[in-house]
């Protein structure tokens, strides 16, 4: 036929059998990719340290999605929460991956069958004998089935009635585990960080989908609406489907980037706003203050801070720090975290406690400035030593560590003090292994950043696709110069379907 690459889809325009075939093949490709990617990630994933080397630091992309739906065990004998297990059952990570690959193979065979046997009776109009689809009826069927699946997920899987539940954690991502979730029917269900809203919204949306599906199965669209929205044209279906997909992509890009109950920080890493707002820093200070109020020493109070909480309070885990074209996992950037060195507290020679001003998200370099409790600058690492008044040497700054590996260790040597002041700009200080993966020391983004960028980009692309195909179907008669109500389309000597010699070229 000699079709240009951008017109190849016209081959399924009036061919319901092969239209179905290519969609089944698309499902085969998607499921096959998901299963294969899962097996690849499992082959390279190291589950040995869920605290300092979690899945999101290792650049895992599909493992977090499996985990949030209730998969936690591997046939390799490990659990995502740490420790070993003896009976992971069929629905392990490998089991889910295998199920996707088997499903992909079955879809592949089904696609071939439907490509060969495309001319089925079910696709032909009994009155005219031509291929035709009752699109409003198909819409009703699909809406009904989607509603059943949505309701079933919310009522059974999420609630644990028949299923594992979902991943639920505390606000600081410390105690996450898979558990059953009760639906939240009150106003709290609309809080994006309340897991109960996931159950209740799926139940409500599923019920609505079932009722809407039954409505569209039992009520025919009015003739004017049918013609006005071109409901008999498959390109109308394409346009509205693209609209649904791009809308969903925009929504999930938002819930991923800003955070929600569906994107736990234990699985996808913290959000940039948690760094910007000092979210974890405030909680750490609150816990230390509570410890001091219970007559604990500073060392004891800091030693009780979970390493996991301290690790979140490190700029290297901020997804906005990764550059656009920096491929690879976070571990390939600043290295694999080995241990928390402890919290450094700086003091000048007068005994005032000094705080290092933290680096904002979008800075690559930032001046080292130490302020006192009132925000007054007391020390810095000057750019021009000749004019300095607040240098570490002049002010006599010392540093002492509390908690972590250097608990109780203090330094007064200015070179060492400046080294730790620079590192304190980046949050809590960790020992990082850059040798194992030959990490280059340049920050990378987490899967949270990749997912957001990918979905926002494709959503924008699909938005234009919706406008394009919507305009084509609504204004087809204008573009073609032909009355859409003609018995057979006459597109100035061209076939209705390019390369199809059976299409009539004129009426009669």
From Swiss-Prot:
Q: Where is the protein localized?
A: Plastid, Chloroplast thylakoid membrane
Q: Does the keyword Transcription apply?
A: no
- Which residues span the membrane? 21-36, 101-115, 140-156, 203-218, 237-252, 457-472
What is the membrane topology listed in the Swiss-Prot or TrEMBL record?
Answer: Multi-pass membrane protein
Any one Gene Ontology cellular component term annotated for this protein: chloroplast thylakoid membrane
From the UniProt annotation, give the residues forming the signal peptide.
none
Known function: One of the components of the core complex of photosystem II (PSII). It binds chlorophyll and helps catalyze the primary light-induced photochemical processes of PSII. PSII is a light-driven water:plastoquinone oxidoreductase, using light energy to abstract electrons from H(2)O, generating O(2) and a proton gradient subsequently used for ATP formation.
Subunit structure, briefly? PSII is composed of 1 copy each of membrane proteins PsbA, PsbB, PsbC, PsbD, PsbE, PsbF, PsbH, PsbI, PsbJ, PsbK, PsbL, PsbM, PsbT, PsbX, PsbY, PsbZ, Psb30/Ycf12, at least 3 peripheral proteins of the oxygen-evolving complex and a large number of cofactors. It forms dimeric complexes.
This chain belongs to the protein called: Photosystem II CP47 reaction center protein
Q: Which organism is it from?
A: Lactuca sativa
């Amino acid at each position: 036929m000699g079709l240009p690459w951008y017109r190849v889809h016209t081959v399924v325009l009036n061919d319901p059998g092969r239209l179905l075939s290519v969609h089944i093949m698309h499902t085969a490709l998607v499921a096959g990719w998901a299963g294969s990617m899962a097996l690849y990630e499992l082959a390279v994933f190291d589950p040995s340290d869920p605290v300092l080397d979690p899945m999101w630091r290792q650049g895992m992309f599909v493992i977090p999605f499996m985990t949030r739906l209730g998969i936690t065990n591997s046939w390799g004998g490990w659990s995502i929460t740490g420790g070993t297990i003896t009976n992971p059952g069929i629905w392990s990570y490998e089991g889910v991956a295998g199920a996707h690959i088997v499903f992909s193979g079955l879809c592949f065979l089904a696609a071939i069958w439907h490509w060969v046997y495309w001319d089925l009776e079910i696709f032909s109009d009994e009155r005219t004998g031509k291929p035709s689809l009752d699109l409003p009826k198909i819409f009703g069927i699909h809406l009904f089935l989607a509603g059943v699946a949505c309701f079933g997920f919310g009522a059974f899987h999420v609630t644990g009635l028949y299923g594992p539940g979902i991943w639920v954690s505390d606000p600081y991502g410390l105690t996450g585990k898979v558990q059953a979730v009760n639906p939240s029917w009150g106003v709290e269900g609309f809080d994006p960080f309340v897991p109960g809203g996931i159950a209740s919204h799926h139940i409500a949306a599923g019920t609505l989908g079932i009722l809407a599906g039954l409505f569209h199965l039992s009520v025919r669209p009015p003739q004017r609406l049918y013609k006005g929205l071109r409901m008999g044209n498959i390109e109308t279906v394409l346009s509205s489907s693209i609209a649904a997909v791009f809308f969903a992509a925009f929504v999930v890009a938002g819930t991923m980037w800003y955070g929600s109950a569906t994107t736990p920080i234990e699985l996808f890493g913290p959000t940039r706003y948690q760094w910007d707002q000092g979210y974890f820093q405030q909680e750490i200070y609150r816990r230390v203050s509570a410890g001091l109020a219970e007559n604990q020493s500073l060392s004891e109070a800091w030693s009780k801070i979970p390493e996991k909480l301290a690790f979140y309070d490190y700029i290297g885990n901020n997804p906005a720090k990764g550059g656009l074209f920096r491929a690879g996992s976070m571990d390939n950037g600043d290295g694999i975290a080995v241990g928390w060195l402890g919290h450094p507290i700086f003091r000048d020679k007068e005994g005032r406690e000094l705080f290092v001003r933290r680096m904002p998200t979008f800075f690559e370099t930032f001046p080292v400035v130490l302020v006192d409790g009132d925000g007054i600058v007391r020390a810095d690492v000057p750019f021009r030593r000749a004019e300095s008044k607040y240098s570490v040497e002049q002010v006599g700054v010392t540093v002492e560590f509390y908690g972590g590996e250097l608990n109780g260790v203090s330094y007064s040597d200015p070179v060492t003090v400046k080294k730790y002041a620079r590192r304190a700009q980046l949050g809590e200080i960790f020992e990082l292994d850059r040798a194992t993966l030959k990490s280059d020391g340049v920050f990378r983004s987490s899967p949270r950043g990749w997912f957001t960028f990918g979905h926002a980009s494709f959503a924008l692309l699909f938005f234009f696709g919706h406008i394009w195909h919507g305009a084509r179907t609504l204004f087809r008669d204008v573009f073609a110069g032909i009355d859409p109500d003609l018995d057979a389309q006459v597109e100035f000597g061209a076939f209705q379907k390019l390369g199809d010699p059976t299409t009539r070229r004129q009426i009669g």
